[in-house]
Structures are given as C-alpha cells and as structure tokens.
Amino acid sequence: MKITPVNEKIGAFVEDVNLNSLAIHEFETLYQALLRHKVLFFRDQPLSTEEHIALGQRFGALEPPHPFFPHLTDNDQVVIIETARGNPPSKSYWHTDMTWQVVPPKCSILHAQFVPEQGGDTIWCDMAGVWADLSAAEQSELRSLETIHALHAFEDSRYDHLDANGESIVIKRSRDYPPIRRPMMQVHPETGQEVLFINEQFTRSIINWSESASQLRLSALFSKARQVQYQVRFSWQKGSVAIWDNRATQHFAVTDYGDTPRRLHRVTVQGEPSLAGKPYLP
C-alpha cells in the first residue's frame, strides 16, 4: 500500500490496495491515514453495492436513510447523488454532512459510478487547520459561542416539493429534525484536534447574536474555508472512491458540468455521541 499526501494539511492518494479485501492491518493503516490526512482518494475500485456497504461498516454502523436524498431500491443506506439530462445540479454550498441531526456523521464513502469527462470535481477543506490559524483572541471569543444548525438549506431545492396538501416536504419533514445548537469549536474525539465546526449550508446563526452581527461574523469565517491553502481538490473518474472525516472537514461540489450525466453512491457512518448537539429552544 502506498499513501501519498497531496499537501501538508489535507488529502492523500492511496495506491496498491483493494478496498474489497482489506486485511486487518491494511484497514488499520487506512484508518490512521484518514485521521492524519482527513480525506483519502482511491482509483479503479469496482465496488459492488454489498462491498460498498461492507467497507462502510468497517468504520462503524451506517446512517439510516437520508430524509430527502434518493437511495438504491434494494438498499436504502446507499444514497444516490445524480445529475441527468434536463436535471442539472442545485446550487452548491460548502457543507459538513448532516450537521442538522443530533449526532453528525463520522465519515462518508463516495463511489463514482459514471462522471463527466470534464468538471464535477469535489473540494475538501481542513477545518482543524482553519481553526489553528485563527488568532488567540479569535479562538478565545469563539470558544464561548454556540451556533444553530438546521435543515433550512434544502427548502426550495431540487429535493423539495409540495405534498398533496400543498405543503413543502422539507418543512414537513424538518419537524422530525428540529434545529440543533452546537459549540462553534468542537474537539475531534479521536485526534484531539480543535475544529471550527460550522458550515455555510447548515449553520444558520450564532446564538444570542443579532441576525446582522451573526451573518457578518459567520460570513467572515466561511470565507476562510474558501482559501486554497486549506483545501484539496479531487477530479473524479469511474471507480474512484473518496473517504473523508466528517468531524474535521467540509466539502464543496463543483457544478461546472451542466446536465452532463453524473452518478455517485454514498454510504455514511454514524458519529460519536460525544459530538451530539442539543435541541435549540428559543
């Protein structure tokens, strides 16, 4: 197995490995590499649905079905991320997966089924690196702050529609996922790194701040995730796999390919109770 870092902060390519048949020592090497590099990239991995699920289960129990994303008919734990002719992707946002639920996921495994010849890259950002580069004064202030995470970003998206009563399905299902309050800084449960745990898509506001002050401060912090020194960018090919640590990163899907067909399958691993948020009760 050969592991080649992309840069000093985030990302590594893994070669000479078959994800279908990892020995125990190989999996442990990969796991430690994931903690170190935060996102791992693989080429030419012909995973079946069963093999994809089995790989995910080696990292932990899988998340139940996503409330909005489509999934495979024969296994609802495999999410389909797809663009088809006449159905281009929605607007993309920087995000950490599913921070709107009480316990955010541990990691995700994305497998490319077919992709455009050009475009459709994904970019990841090292949010531990962003936090580490804040000034001591900024860190001191942010440690005391909490933010609200919510499902609002799905409203009016391609995943939203009206039910038979004319009600938004996102708003309706959001009742099962009320807003969550989280510390702005969270400690990674395995590495001990401090992480700026906010994201553009699901972090709505800072608790006890005015709307204007909250958005101004969040926007300034979000802008740091757009700085290339914290990023790694991956170009997909058929059979490519990316595994990322959801507790230390956020990511962005580049939607520069119009409605060219693109399909990826994702399994997501449940997170640790130590990172559980609390219901927000205004």
Regions found by a protein language model. Give the residues of each.
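Non-heme Fe(II) oxygenase catalytic core, chiefly the N-lobe of the double-stranded beta-helix
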Residues: M1-V241, N246-P282
